[in-house]
A protein has these predicted regions:
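Short amphipathic alpha-helical segments
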Residues: 35-58, 93-96
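Short, Lys/Arg-enriched N-terminal segments with co-localized hydrophobic residues
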Residues: 4-20
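Short N-terminal leader segment in a subset of presequences, especially plant chloroplast
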Residues: 10, 29-34
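Residue-level signal for well-ordered alpha-helical positions
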Residues: 42, 64, 88-91, 100
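Glycine-rich beta-strand-turn "strand-cap" elements at beta-sheet edges
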Residues: 15-18, 28, 59-71, 96-118
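Short, well-ordered beta-strand segments in beta-rich or mixed alpha/beta enzyme
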Residues: 23-30, 60-89
Length: 118
C-alpha cells in the first residue's frame, strides 16, 4: 500500500513540473555541551527556519536529533535546483546562520545528493 501511494505522489510531482530535480544536503552540526541542539532551537525561535522554508525553491528544511549522538544535529535541506541553493547562499539568512554556528562553536559535516529525473 505505501509503495502505491509513493508512486502516485512521484507521478503527480513529475506531471506538475514536467520533470524533476532535487538537491538534498544533509548538514551535521557537531558541538559540545548541548550546543548543537541550542543552535537548532535558536534557528527555530529566531524565525530563520521559517524564512528559509519560505524561500523560492526550498522543498524541505528539517532538523533531526540522532539517538546515539546527543552532540550532533542533522539538518535535511532539500532544494529544487542549484540556482535556488545559490540564491539562498547569498541571502542575509546565511550570514545569520553563520553567526549562530560561530556562537555555538559548531563543526559541520556535509553530504550532498542529487536526484534527477526526466
Amino acid at each position: 500500500m505505501f509503495g502505491k501511494k509513493c508512486e502516485k505522489y512521484v507521478r503527480n510531482y513529475i506531471n506538475e513540473r514536467g520533470s524533476y530535480m532535487s538537491i538534498t544536503v544533509n548538514l551535521y552540526y557537531i558541538g559540545t555541551n548541548g550546543n548543537a541542539r541550542k543552535f537548532a532551537e535558536d534557528m527555530v525561535s529566531s524565525g530563520i527556519v521559517d524564512a528559509v522554508r519560505a524561500e523560492e525553491g526550498n522543498e524541505r528544511y528539517e532538523y533531526f536529533f540522532p539517538m546515539d549522538d546527543p552532540e550532533t544535529v542533522l539538518l535535511i535541506d532539500r532544494w529544487k535546483n542549484q540556482e535556488a541553493i545559490d540564491i539562498h547562499h547569498k541571502s542575509e539568512m546565511m550570514k545569520q546562520i553563520a553567526e549562530l554556528r560561530d556562537k555555538y562553536k559548531l563543526r559541520l559535516r556535509v553530504e550532498r545528493y542529487v536526484d534527477e529525473g526526466k
